[in-house]
């Protein structure tokens, strides 16, 4: 399915029903009092997260949503029917912004919990409400108020425990395929991944975490170059970042320079991302079969980056070192979630 992570829509809550102007007219009761009923409230609009959705594609085709109006009141003190509420299903992780003001209205991350986005209009009052000792036959009513209308910008941020970042062709898609049931597209050219892919990594029957394959970044991504600009935001929700580096690039580029380019993009986009746990994953060790040469390459990269955190050497395509990496990730994620509890 095509991944769509932004959409613009308009929502309009229902208008409240008008109050009724009516008087009781029955045989032998020539001067019956007022009996105009109130209108019904307009329907409100709610957003609710659904685990069955993973894209905002539907909002590209349906851009306007309107809840039902409340019905007007009737004689005999009959209240108008309330307008039905409209509940709009969105993927887990959807951020709802007011498109006109930029205000964040809701961060919808819990499935099954409706979040009010547009309040329905208040019902109008019938003339019965205005009866008093000095006004036995009021002809005053009030109309229902209009419902809230908003222009919204929806933004979907991937909810994942682990985010993979690295240059195109660093082997991120291969890694996520190797450790999960994800069917990420893999080919020998840049930008194979055109949208964030999620994979569930199961380390035991009862323990798992979600890994996000963020599209490859290039220098200038923070300013919109390549595919990185619109996907860097997905890293903000992860617990830990895996910096995947091709240890033996076919184009002869310097892995240290490549890694520094990615770190520079993170710093420019959001320096807070550098405060997250970041582990170095040196991929494609199978391309350096000589053990001495491989170890020298690994140490030169670690020294060149002045890397202080954990380092893992793996071959995603041969699943070497991936199990150790997944167990370490699961342990870290468990510890982080326990500390937050």
From Swiss-Prot:
Compartmental location: Cytoplasm
GO biological process, one term: ribosome biogenesis
Cofactor(s) demanded: Mg(2+)
Binding, GTP: 166-173, 191-195, 213-216, 283-286, 315-317
Single GO MF descriptor: GTPase activity
GO cellular component labels: cytoplasm
Positions of the UniProt region annotated as Disordered: 128-150
Claim: Magnesium is one of the keywords in the record: yes
Coiled coil: none
Signal peptide from the UniProt entry: none
Obg domain sequence ranges: 1-159
Segments passing through the bilayer: none
EC number: 3.6.5.-
Residue intervals of the OBG-type G domain: 160-334
Keywords, sorted A to Z: Cytoplasm, GTP-binding, Hydrolase, Magnesium, Metal-binding, Nucleotide-binding
Sequence similarity: Belongs to the TRAFAC class OBG-HflX-like GTPase superfamily. OBG GTPase family.
Subunit structure: Monomer.
Protein name: GTPase Obg
